[in-house]
């Protein structure tokens, strides 16, 4: 008799949970972006492009200095090199934070 009562109570609890779940609003898709708005992926891609441009400019300036092109100063080469280095380090840190955030989300219990 006790098992029958527990089973009935379990069924009532399940029906109550089902009714609660059915009353919740449905999940909707992500809202559409307005024209001119950028996604995170777009911004990240632009940042990577800027880092690449900085490195290319640094390399070109260093090559121009090495061949003795006039108007290219050693200080300009060193500043461009440091800018490229700092931008690469910053991009690496952003990548590390993104990977860590992804791992944290994947380890969350569902």
From Swiss-Prot:
Coiled coil start-end: none
Tagged with keyword Iron: no
A family per Pfam: FliE
Subcellular location per the Swiss-Prot or TrEMBL entry: Bacterial flagellum basal body
InterPro entries per UniProt: FliE
Chief place where the protein resides: other
GO terms (BP aspect): bacterial-type flagellum-dependent cell motility
GO molecular function: cytoskeletal motor activity; structural molecule activity
One GO CC annotation: bacterial-type flagellum basal body
Keywords of the record: Bacterial flagellum
Keyword Membrane: no
Protein family membership: Belongs to the FliE family.
PANTHER family noted in UniProt: FLAGELLAR HOOK-BASAL BODY COMPLEX PROTEIN FLIE, PTHR34653
Protein name, as recorded: Flagellar hook-basal body complex protein FliE
Gene for this chain: fliE
